[in-house]
Amino acid sequence: MKPTTRCPFDYLVSQCGKHHFKTFVQLLSPLLQDEDPDRYALILDIMDAVHFSAILIDDIANQSALRRNQPAAHVVFGETETATRAYLVLLRVVNRTMRENPVLAGELLNSLEEIHQGQDESLVWRRDGLETFPVADDERLAAYVRMSRLKTGSLFVLLGRLLANGGTEFDDLLVRFGLYAQLQHDCKNIYSPEYALNKGSVAEDLRNGELSYPVVVALIENKAEGIVGEALRTRSDGDTEQALRVLESPAVKDACLHALEAASVGLEDLVEAWGRREKMRSDTLDGDDLTRPSTITQHEQDDHVDRAAIDAKSDASGSSNKSLTPPETAPTTDTLSETAVGDISSVDVDYWTRRCVPIIGSLLKSCRVYSEAERETQLRFLQEHVLPNLGPRPSSPGSQIQSMATFSGFPLQPSINLSGSGQAKVRYTFEPLDSLSGTEVDPFALAPAQRVLEKLSTLLGVWPGWIDALIAAYHPTREEVEQLHPNLHEYLRGVLVRTTGRQDVQVPPMPRMWVCFVALDLEGASQALKVYFDPKIKEAVTGIPSCKYTCQILRTVDRFGNAKAVDMLEQFLAEEHSIGAVELIAIDCVPEEMQPSARIKVYVHTMSNSFQTVRKYMTMGGRCMDPATLEGLENLHDVWYSLLGESQGIVNEEYSKPLTGFSSMQHHLYFSYEMTPGNADPGVKVYIPVQSYAPDDKTIAQNYEANFRQLNWPWGEPGVYEAVIESALGPVKHSRATFLHGGSSFIFSKGRGVYQSIYLDPPLEEGGNIAVFEHHDDQDTIVDLGNM
């Protein structure tokens, strides 16, 4: 699929629509299009250039993550390119106007000066708080009106001057409307949950220190100099929340909404033409939509977004002006009402209980680090919070979708994590699904993913900022799903052709792409949350390579601040011609006080498994040559032959072992680059799809035991690892089409030495029958490593 946008300006126009002022032109000068089509076209292009360029710069200044519930242009293209394009568009339209109509060019330049003068005045107030703002009530209101007349009114006056060929007959009308438009914007920013959803932040103006109309009213009506002034000065979350409560008090809110209603009198036609239908509700104004005089339809009432949910999310996250879309109101789920939640049946939950609890229970016991009470707690958590979110059982009447968490289609992937002396812990990853997943209502299973993330982040007490940010960045909108769905096969085939260099690739049937995996590390009786996102969906719908898109996103993520590591990764992948190789994005989800140690991980693929490739990607082309990295490479070199199933060893570091053909979608290797806030040196982990280099699970088990012996781990004793797997998943010698093993990862750090993870793919039986292997929860089936 070809890119849908060429630059930040075109990207914004694609979101908002071309010729934004067309209805105004037709209302104020209905004959212009027929009488002077050239001037008509020029006026529309001038207004688009001025309006959209201002939006591009505003979004940068406000650090807005979203625009109309999609990533803002600077998030996608970067701040420098976005600002440069905005000014380039303005310069071009000025030059064009000077050539085609010098009279209009003069009006355009005058208006641009006034617009920027008003914006400058607003930014000075933002910088200085109340220090340079008038003290007297009437002077404060007059200052606000003057700023509004310049910043917003000049835009509409420009339209009138262009229509009147430099005349002033529309000035009074459009000055009034400019004030209305500014009031409307300021009120929506505080009082409209729908607007907050589209912008990805509640009360963005207040959090940025903007002296908007509700702030001015609060200063006048409530004499709230102390509370509001402190919020403007400190910009702290606590002070901002106190100020927001003042702005949302009935006295301030009703005064603002009454002023907005009064400003619209006599402008009804212009108000209707302007649109901006986000709803605002007042405690004393009968819930009317105060953005326009017409009545709210029942459909609009049904679509109303619960402000309390957004506020609760902001409170939980301590959100700043960059806080992003709450999971329950993220893209595409606006069509799913609460009654449309696709809960699965108790029969389905019972099926997953029978399938999953014995597997996790067996692995917990085999690790010998979990007490009986801890195992019971972990299994109870699994049953209460995970199993109801695995979707319908396979081939049941309501089954619509097969999980993409494993190659077998099983929706939960257990893994065993070994480190240091070989001590093992359990982890599992699952794809949230429900009975509507895969249907026309929710073909990509977005709703259960966002619902589960919200519930788990609240339950586990984690800071949701990164979750919200990446939902906004990577989860597709409804329109993007509709765009991608029929073209998915074409996109996937194009990816395979590019990565393999072959035209004869076969793309397996894939009705969708995954949007979210949830992982839980089991630490004693507690759980550590990680979340994975697929960047390929945005690559498919925007045409922006996954690496470029991801790096732009990471540079704007709140409380990350690691542009140096991001730049290093982007430069390295560009050198390797791998800008489309980013396959996964993962985040640690931790309590707010632990956020400085949280990781963001970027996963990339390679089409070679030679150790030369490993060395290049582990050192990022020689950029990371610290002692820990080099020691890790030495340790990995010692076990590399066993991970690739080469029992005789590998002499030539340039040797790349061919894949077995297990899956045409499988790459040779994966690497993850782990970045923490402020740390410029990423940790690098290599992932080996062992099922692509071995004939069967029996061989893989033997290779792992050789691997563990090389590291002097107790699981390397003959038959030990194999017994662990068989006690959980059944015989390693089987005739199924899919493997029990899903891959292995390897990383080395100075603190804990080698850290290796073994990923498992439980078999997916059809019809809900457990026919392949019957689990037993008696001690004889559990491998005891306590005396080894």
From Swiss-Prot:
Residues that hold Mg(2+) 1 according to the record: 58
Induction: Expression is down-regulated when the stress-activated mitogen-activated protein kinase (sakA) is deleted.
EC number(s) per entry: 2.5.1.-
Enzymatic class: transferase
Entry binding sites for Mg(2+) 2: 58
Span list, region Disordered: 283-337
Keywords carried by this UniProt record: Magnesium, Metal-binding, Transferase
Function: Multi-functional prenyltransferase; part of the gene cluster that mediates the biosynthesis of lolitrems, indole-diterpene mycotoxins that are potent tremorgens in mammals, and are synthesized by clavicipitaceous fungal endophytes in association with their grass hosts. The geranylgeranyl diphosphate (GGPP) synthase ltmG is proposed to catalyze the first step in lolitrem biosynthesis. LtmG catalyzes a series of iterative condensations of isopentenyl diphosphate (IPP) with dimethylallyl diphosphate (DMAPP), geranyl diphosphate (GPP), and farnesyl diphosphate (FPP), to form GGPP.
Protein name (Swiss-Prot/TrEMBL): Multi-functional prenyltransferase ltmE
Gene from which the chain derives: ltmE
